[in-house]
Amino acid sequence: MQFLSTFVMQPLSFLPDSFAEYEDLRAILDQGSASFAIRTVCETTVRGRQFAVHTASIGSTDPQAPAIGFFGGIHGLERIGSQLVLDYMRALLARLEWDELLVRQLQSIRLIFMPIVNPGGMWAATRANPNGVDLMRNAPQNADERVPLLAGGQRVGAWLPWYRGRAGAPMEPEAAALLRVVETELASRPLSIALDCHSGYGWSDSIWFPYARTRKLMPHLPEMYVLKTMFERAHPHHGYAFEPQSHQYLLHGDLWDFAYDRAPASNVFLPMTLELGSWLWIKKNPRQLFSRQGMFNPVKAHRTARVLRRHANLLDFLARAAFSSQRWLPQGNRREQLLQSAIDLWYKPESL
């Protein structure tokens, strides 16, 4: 029986101890140890493997300086989002060796990176974390209208996807860590921006902003409208659908809704989700449908490279917008006019 037990358990030894994105992150943190302020904000264990959730920060240490947070890997299957943030971190370190404009920029703003929020899920190739909880459904608030069956968040059990966790239970460690990072590193500042990179929904790429729980207007709609307008003028062929998430679907427990509502009202906190549309990748390579990874990530190397190139402009734009915020943040009558323009664009009946 002892031999049989050993034989049955043997396949576990062939499971990898890590995964490519996590090793990339460790290499980047090692390379950038003299430039980044590195923290471990929580740890997670999956099948005997332990992974740390890291943040890396760089730039101004002034707590009043504008800041941008780049997040990825909240869903373990969506590797391309983590790859995008990691690629940007790697490029940033390379540019620091010669880019004087970047050095000056970082004297006035701060960048915070959290590229793999859910390393346990990414190692296990699951959307959820090791406890079976979908982190992007884990916040306590409920939508104020009906949500899509299951996909909007459910409490039936972890054996079904989009599980929110038990009602009244503490939030999952990874979700709580993300919220702490937002609270201490971003939302406490007069201006902060967050970009959370996901994949797997739609024929095209989208930039979503609050709310996901309601169709009501976010208080900083004028600021979001200005940001959209500036980006379109700087990159007129960008191809993103820039809209409230509620235009697509409502959901329970969205972390960014929760973080946004907790931010001090006197500060401007602008959280966004970059949703990379994977359906076009599947259309070009239908065999991806038969792979869990292929449903959420480009498989062919040239397609992955194209995705990483394409979205770097957005990340650079957000950093420049934060640096130049005094030139575009709306005030007074202009803000009221922009609010009406935003309502006309996103909330008139014909736009819904």
What are these regions (language model features)?
Residues 38-49:
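N-terminal cap/lid segment of alpha/beta-hydrolase-fold proteins
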Residues 115-158:
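Surface-exposed loop and adjacent secondary-structure segments within mature catalytic domains
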Residues 2-28, 32-35, 149-352:
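C-terminal accessory segments enriched in acidic
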Residues 54-64:
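Short beta-strand-to-loop junctions in surface cap/lid or active-site-entrance loops
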Residues 73, 113, 135, 195-198:
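Divalent metal-coordination and catalytic microenvironments
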Residues 75, 117-118, 200, 277:
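Catalytic metal-binding/acid-base residues of hydrolase active sites
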Residues 64-65, 80-128:
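Short helix-loop-beta-strand segments that form the rim/entrance of peptidase-like active sites
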Residues 66-73:
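Short beta-strand element of the alpha/beta-hydrolase
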